[in-house]
Amino acid sequence: MLKEELLPGRGSCLRRNNSEWLAVTINCESRSDIMIINDTSLTNKCAQQWTFNIAPRKYYMIVNIGKNLLTIKYNNNISEHEIIYDPYIYENSEKKKINPDDLVKKYSIPDGYIDILSKWYSIKFIYPKYNIIFIKPEMGISIQVHTLRSEKWEILSGKPIVISDNRVYYFVEKGTKFTNEKMKFHSIINPNKSPKTFVAIKEQWSGSFDEEDIKRVYNPNNYQ
């Protein structure tokens, strides 16, 4: 594949380049907001054309966060590049909420949670001072920012890919901690292929905790 198109609100797969340098050129009819992952860097800007290179064996992804169609051209065929995360792998599947009882049995969920927020791709056990969040295999939460709170994350299991501010961290070990300040990008991706390997994180916050506080910059799970 030498070319692909991204509608507004859509992203490419997160891929790993092969042994050759890859040149990428993005074009659109007028200036538009674009986000790219180039290995460990997350960058966004408003542009009509954007050309960049991906080093051998490095990771890359393109997200259309603007309002115009993006046309992406590659100088090499990317068909054989390893897909680490496909945001739309379950796009046409049944969206069934996660059963909290399944998680409570498998993982030693501490007593004392006061609420549960279950979605089809993640589930959150809400405690008075922290949350425990589980993310299904091959799924990710939205790339988002908060306007009223900052968050601290601790990885509990699953070796996720973590976006924090403008950096991307791959296959993160248990016990690693991140601080996500207000209005800074953050997200978590579960790259595991096994259907039983959930990613789990502990989330704490400072400021005002309100689900309406979330601004989802890229939300692949809200399929249009």
What is each residue range found by the language model?
Residues 36-61, 164-186:
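Short acidic-glycine-tyrosine-enriched beta hairpin
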Residues 1-19, 54-131, 142-143, 214-224:
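A short, N-terminal "cap"/entry segment at the start of jelly-roll beta-barrel domains
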